[in-house]
């Protein structure tokens, strides 16, 4: 008979033991090795006492998986999933089950990281390249990005690009047609204010009346009208205006492309291509421009290059445009955006093929034709004379019609001017049209869908004017024409997955990235229709489940961060930075201090920080760090005093980007506050704070939180992410608002930073589940175990590699930096060589050359077991032994396993391999552990320079994949 109590047998803390990698016995073994008695002892040795929380968090007890699922099921059931015809950029979809199961719900796709190591990311790089091909084909332009966050932020990026490339250098006006989606205008205005641009809104035809650097048009527009802008665009371009277009991706299967009309930039949401609405996200935006603007494009771009064997290979192109290199001079602060969703959209296009997509688009248009025919037959007046999917009606009794609609569980678009609209989508069927007739006309209308259909077949429809009917063939590449069978599609997805290394294969120890477990139980609710199928602009009383979830998650985050309130809207970490800095900016303006525009940033900061500051209209001043990587207090004090009249804020990261808890963090906050500035604490390293300290307790005023790092949302191969901000009470009135949905916050009047009021709301259940399941004890123990794992690796490797920075008692926080520069001096082996060699050992490289060039930053997270840590340590020690052979001259500097890494099957099958000074076994099976779990890179080291000099960002011939 067991002596355990019933409470113990109920295993409420079982999830904690599943989430944390090392078990109790392994933890004690590791603690003994590093010289600590317990996790509490390690914490006391590592974290400065003056910033330790005086008491534990109060976020509730841990709970079991079944209990957590039952609780969130209760929340989900409070959402009312009506049939939504609201449109405005969000539409019902039928996610192909082969994509839902094999991509969206597959850790091989959702747990990978941004493809900085392209040799072990060829699968998703191919899928992203397909996305770029879809974007280019449908828009009729030359060069596409790998995705942006959403349509509205893409519009803001298009405006910024227009200013950068416009030859009308004296112009400062950006024109926005008055029929764009309101959330897009909202985000554009927010961004324009920071840049000092003037935004003029008016009828599209009036754009020619202004001296502009750029203009934005919606195609099709808010009420559904389709307009041929060819002549207008030509006139604008003659006047040196950069023409940007927000386009509907599904409509472009039938409509003349914006590129053919003369647009310079085309963007939009790819949500209609198989991605659920999700109460606003996450969705991928496409962004396409003329080739001449390629150096000014925002975001990632995937390009084709060659590897050392001369084979085609994919990689991220033109990275010198981006924030991690150009910092405040970057085109955008965007890091990666929505790669998982872009991949879903690309697979949707591959699975349906051009004919299938055209059939879907034609069905939507036919149903819209039938709806319009029925309504006009009954005397209703349409507000639009052309359409793809949206019918708008004016002069009707909107209140009565909307009441009938709500009673029938139908949402219509209700405009302020007495117009209502119906946007049809892929999920609409003929019985829905009959139901809409009932809702709009009342019972007894006598209309028959089949009769109208027969008439349209016989006599045609002019909903799309002849001049706007697409004539050119699209998606002609073989990839879009060979996988329409589910068997073939399943195998294609699997072939690509097999080329990529994700967390389902091995640890990804990227410093500052927190690649922890994304537990299956946390992911389950995201696919539920109660979360997936909600329109973000539905009435709030239909979204009571989401409201409860957001409120509870916000309360969790308030307690964890020590702030007073949280804004959920930012849909990436970079957007969170931007939103937090905007709150600071507006706070200063409210006090008559609009001149405060200096942002102090330590030289060790991530490149996103200065890029975000520039985006918020601030001027960056860099402060020095000392030899230990800490903020130089004297330099900070001097610059804060010198800039006191114009000081807006400081952006700092804690623990520092050097992986240590700086002892002087409170003094940093006090100095900045003394001179009238605010403290922005970057939440990138929050995984070393939760339960031990907090930004608010330290003295910061605002932070963004990377829910895709600390709070278990997966990285998706480069997105999605979420970057909500926590603020002290004095900044709460200045966080992002929204023009469409106003839930009653004191900040509702502020502009938006994302298209949807709650950003990528459908992935919030992941973070809610993470916190709910772990509870007070679990989140603290997770942080402590992250410290343990990092210090264990640091001490194990310190006998073989110099450790660059340590804090008190020679401890590191949740990550450590090893210095490879001395080895480069003695052997010629670079950090790149070591990173690629780790691929042969079955590992993704740690972060290279950040925050210090010539280093690797290692962050194991709490989720990795001692077995996996030891396997990684063994690999690093083995690599050090290989470097020793190079140092000793046993292997040439230019012909050794590191220089030639990674090794592929083609290498070891090559008879010429025998001329190398090392064996095939050394190349591909350097340790016994590798033999047991071999990952094969599918290409050799890729030539980045060749790829940028010979830029190609579209699908390569199919033979290159064979």
Curated annotation (Swiss-Prot):
Keywords, in A-Z order: Oxidoreductase, Pyridoxal phosphate
Cofactor(s) required for function per UniProt: pyridoxal 5'-phosphate
Swiss-Prot/TrEMBL GO biological process terms: glycine decarboxylation via glycine cleavage system
Q: Which residues carry this modification: N6-(pyridoxal phosphate)lysine?
A: 709
| InterPro entries membership | GcvP, GDC-P_C, GDC-P_N, GDC_P, PyrdxlP-dep_Trfase, PyrdxlP-dep_Trfase_major, PyrdxlP-dep_Trfase_small
This enzyme catalyses: N(6)-[(R)-lipoyl]-L-lysyl-[glycine-cleavage complex H protein] + glycine + H(+) = N(6)-[(R)-S(8)-aminomethyldihydrolipoyl]-L-lysyl-[glycine-cleavage complex H protein] + CO2
- One of the record's GO cellular component terms: glycine cleavage complex
Q: What Enzyme Commission number does this protein have?
A: 1.4.4.2
One GO term in the molecular function aspect is: pyridoxal phosphate binding
Function per UniProt: The glycine cleavage system catalyzes the degradation of glycine. The P protein binds the alpha-amino group of glycine through its pyridoxal phosphate cofactor; CO(2) is released and the remaining methylamine moiety is then transferred to the lipoamide cofactor of the H protein.
Q: How does it assemble?
A: The glycine cleavage system is composed of four proteins: P, T, L and H.
Give the similarity note. Answer: Belongs to the GcvP family.
> Under what name is this protein listed?
Glycine dehydrogenase (decarboxylating)
